[in-house]
From Swiss-Prot:
Leader sequence residues: none
Catalytic activity reported: 5-O-(1-carboxyvinyl)-3-phosphoshikimate = chorismate + phosphate
Record protein name field: Chorismate synthase
Annotated gene: aroC
Keyword list, A-Z: Amino-acid biosynthesis, Aromatic amino acid biosynthesis, FAD, Flavoprotein, FMN, Lyase, NADP
Species for this entry: Saccharolobus solfataricus (strain ATCC 35092 / DSM 1617 / JCM 11322 / P2) (Sulfolobus solfataricus)
UniProt superkingdom: Archaea
Residues noted as binding FMN in the record, renumbered to the chain: R126, A127, S128, G286, K301, P302, T303, S304, S305, R328
GO BP of this protein: amino acid biosynthetic process; aromatic amino acid family biosynthetic process; chorismate biosynthetic process
Pathway: Metabolic intermediate biosynthesis; chorismate biosynthesis; chorismate from D-erythrose 4-phosphate and phosphoenolpyruvate: step 7/7
Molecular function per GO: chorismate synthase activity; FMN binding
Binding residue positions for NADP(+): R48
Family note: Belongs to the chorismate synthase family.
Described function: This reaction introduces a second double bond into the aromatic ring system.
Cofactor binding note: Reduced FMN (FMNH(2)).
Length: 391
């Protein structure tokens, strides 16, 4: 099974299955001298952890164990290996799935490709969103390293089912959405999302949603003009996330309905520099970052594992049958998916920042390490519940 790695200079390889002993990641290319602790990783993991309100009831603590690459809370320059053990596994929930592939899930394609006898049906195996724990671990390292360029990354849920954000949102509000149980950036929207989730849970159904992620102050000129355009790299990164169905940046698909005179973003003097009036391009022009905020959105489909009965094929007799999926599944995978999108954006930007020379390849100076730590502490403090930010 190839295709388990991402990145060129900052390269990650994820491993593990949903109901295996552990999931984990090997991160290659992190320069020596980066201040990094288990707490730094746990800070990001907490926002995708199951067992909380409105998400999967699977009670995982998601405690990261660092196996290599860090000594005295500093990276050594060697590969960083981190695992998270799977401690709340109930494989009996998947006994029926062994014979009845779930509609909307990867079950049947995996059987077709790898063979029924080789298919790990427990929790979806490698196709499970549990794999994204590894991405968030790596994303935490990438986010901290990006503090060297003062690039901050945060996301929120722009829509959930039929409900959507209808007003402008500040980056500070997006940061605060981390502590919203439904990743809403506005209090009234949070209440609407919560009502939808309760409804879906009662009906044994699920909802999809749109995640929006903003990267503030990315280095200028990241990406390449042809095949390695920043938009192409981000699209690949984000579309690799389970349940993601679509990707856009800036104006996105709305631009197809506009005139050139409307969609062209006027170039102006902006904060004593040359900039763009509205950032319609979402921070990317010609495949290169242009100094404006990088803004991307992606669509998550509704969680495919639902209690509502749906038609499938019983593989024991190849007759049509029905399946009602029991177990502990998210009523909206998009909620926890926001953190995963943030991580993939961070991994893409940090890899290109290293390619462009904006981040050292071998080691950080003491001044650089101190700057990173100070900015990281400020970032962590800035991520706080809406109520605290308004007080």
């Amino acid at each position: 099974m190839p295709g388990n790695s991402f990145g060129k200079l900052f390269r990650i390889t994820t491993f593990g299955e949903s109901h295996g002993p552990a999931v984990g990641v090997v991160i290659d290319g992190v320069p020596a001298g980066l201040p990094l602790t288990v707490e730094d990783i746990k800070f990001e993991l907490e926002f995708r952890r199951p067992g909380r309100l409105y998400v999967s009831g699977r009670r995982e603590k998601d405690e990261p164990e660092i196996l290599s690459g860090i000594f005295n809370n500093r990276t050594t320059g060697s590969p960083i290996a981190v695992i998270v053990r799977n401690t709340d596994v109930i494989s009996s929930f998947y006994d029926e799935i062994k014979y009845k592939p779930r509609p909307g899930h990867a079950d049947l394609p995996f059987i077709m490709k790898y063979g029924y006898e080789n298919w790990d049906y427990r929790g979806g195996g490698r196709a499970s969103a549990r794999e994204t724990v590894s991405r968030v671990i790596a994303g935490a390292v990438a986010k901290k390293l990006l503090m060297l360029t003062d690039t901050w990354i945060a996301g929120h849920l722009r829509s959930l089912g039929p409900e959507e954000l209808s007003e402008e949102v500040t980056f500070e509000e997006v940061l605060c959405s981390k502590y919203s149980p439904v990743r809403a950036s506005k209090k009234d929207l949070e209440e609407k999302y919560e009502a939808l989730i309760k409804k879906a849970t009662q009906e044994g159904d699920s909802y999809g949603g749109i995640a929006e992620v903003i990267a503030k102050n990315p280095p200028i000129g990241l990406g390449e003009p042809v095949f390695d355009k920043m938009k192409a790299e981000l699209a690949k990164a984000i579309m690799s996330i389970p349940a993601v169905m679509g990707f856009e940046y800036g104006l996105g698909f709305i631009a197809s309905k506009m005139k050139g005179s409307e969609a062209n973003d006027e170039i102006i003097r902006k904060n004593n520099r040359i900039g763009w009036k509205y950032n319609y391009a979402g921070g990317i022009l010609g495949g290169l970052t242009n100094g404006e905020d990088l803004i991307v959105r992606c669509a998550f489909k509704p969680t495919s594992s639902i209690r509502k009965p749906q038609k499938t094929i019983d593989l024991r007799n190849l007759e049509e049958s029905y399946i009602s999926v029991i177990g502990r599944h998210d009523p909206a995978v998009a909620i926890r998916g926001v953190t995963v999108v943030e991580s993939m954006v961070a991994l893409t930007i940090v890899d290109h920042a290293m390619r462009a020379g904006a981040i050292p390849l071998v080691k950080l100076t003491e001044d650089q390490a101190n700057t990173i730590q100070q900015r990281w502490e400020r970032y962590v403090k800035s991520c706080k519940p809406m109520e605290e930010s308004q007080s």
